[in-house]
């Protein structure tokens, strides 16, 4: 089973179109580095663009970098021809809880290893693969939200919640949402 999982992960990342960026960089630098096509920014405007195909995010920061799986919902905003925010759902379709939890745990593990810290560990702790978290996530009215930040520069909001998927009406499906931008939630005080 482990060999199959490793092979799947390697294949999933090997040839996947990607958007490779650093928050705040010039839009054209991101476009030239990325293998997924995305339209140019509009000079002197604020707006967003969507990759022309499913793509994964490769966050290229030398200290805080990380990679996501392929995403169907993926928007990159610009202001003054610079990357100004990222919003995405790092999945192609709503997932079963086990599959969604694997992605969330992988992302959080990457962030920990690269120096990201929880913004509010008491009120918005990391999402854990525990019976308590699974019970909470199964409640359609709850879900889980956690915030991570890189020094005092960038912040990530990660949300995992149950999602009604009409294609799979008899299954519990889950949606992961990820936003990256300037810090908008202050650090929790001790």
What is each model feature region?
Residues 10, 20, 105-108, 157:
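Generic detector of well-ordered alpha-helical segments enriched in charged/polar residues
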Residues 2-81, 89-90:
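N-terminal leader/targeting segments
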Residues 70-143, 184, 190:
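Long, charged/polar, surface-exposed segments that mediate recognition or autoinhibition
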């Amino acid at each position: 089973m482990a060999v199959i999982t490793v092979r799947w992960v390697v294949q999933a990342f090997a040839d996947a179109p990607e958007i490779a960026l650093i928050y705040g960089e010039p839009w054209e630098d991101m476009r030239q580095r990325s293998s997924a096509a995305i339209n140019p920014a509009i000079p002197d405007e604020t707006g967003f663009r969507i990759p022309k195909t499913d793509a994964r995010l490769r966050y290229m920061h030398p200290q805080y970098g990380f990679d996501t799986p392929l995403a169907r919902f993926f928007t990159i905003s610009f202001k003054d021809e610079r990357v100004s925010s990222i919003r995405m759902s790092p999945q192609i379709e709503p997932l079963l809880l086990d599959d969604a939890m694997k992605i969330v745990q992988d992302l959080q593990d990457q962030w920990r290893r690269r120096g990201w810290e929880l913004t509010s560990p008491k009120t918005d702790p990391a999402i854990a693969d525990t019976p308590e978290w699974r019970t909470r996530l199964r409640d359609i009215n709850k879900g889980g939200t956690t915030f991570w930040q890189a020094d005092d520069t960038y912040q990530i909001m990660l949300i995992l919640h149950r999602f009604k998927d009409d294609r799979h009406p008899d299954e519990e499906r889950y949606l992961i949402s990820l936003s990256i931008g300037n810090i908008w939630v202050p650090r929790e005080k001790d």
